[in-house]
Amino acid sequence: MADAAPADVKKLSFERAMEELETIVKRLEDGKVPLEESVAIYERGEALKRRCEELLRQAEARVDKITTDAQGQPVGTEPLDVQ
């Protein structure tokens, strides 16, 4: 991460949040980050993880499954049960 202020997590797209999260994981796994910075980027990583989970739940809620009649012909859609 550069010296620029990090983007607001709540405004990030799924792809951007995942990209940043992957960068944070790599930096933490490297073990070369000072303790104070490690704590700060870990906290940001947690926020990014929550954002990704939120966006995935929203996407799942929008997914429809196709319903078919007895002959297998599509007749409509209904919400996908993602439990």
Swiss-Prot record:
<dbReference type="InterPro" id="IPR003761">
    <property type="entry name" value="Exonuc_VII_S"/>
</dbReference>
<dbReference type="GO" id="GO:0009318">
    <property type="term" value="C:exodeoxyribonuclease VII complex"/>
</dbReference>
<keyword id="KW-0963">Cytoplasm</keyword>
<dbReference type="Pfam" id="PF02609">
    <property type="entry name" value="Exonuc_VII_S"/>
</dbReference>
<protein>
    <recommendedName>
        <fullName>Exodeoxyribonuclease 7 small subunit</fullName>
        <ecNumber>3.1.11.6</ecNumber>
    </recommendedName>
</protein>
<keyword id="KW-0540">Nuclease</keyword>
<dbReference type="GO" id="GO:0005829">
    <property type="term" value="C:cytosol"/>
</dbReference>
<keyword id="KW-0269">Exonuclease</keyword>
<dbReference type="GO" id="GO:0006308">
    <property type="term" value="P:DNA catabolic process"/>
</dbReference>
<comment type="subunit">
    <text>Heterooligomer composed of large and small subunits.</text>
</comment>
<keyword id="KW-0378">Hydrolase</keyword>
<comment type="function">
    <text>Bidirectionally degrades single-stranded DNA into large acid-insoluble oligonucleotides, which are then degraded further into small acid-soluble oligonucleotides.</text>
</comment>
<comment type="similarity">
    <text>Belongs to the XseB family.</text>
</comment>
<dbReference type="InterPro" id="IPR037004">
    <property type="entry name" value="Exonuc_VII_ssu_sf"/>
</dbReference>
<dbReference type="GO" id="GO:0008855">
    <property type="term" value="F:exodeoxyribonuclease VII activity"/>
</dbReference>
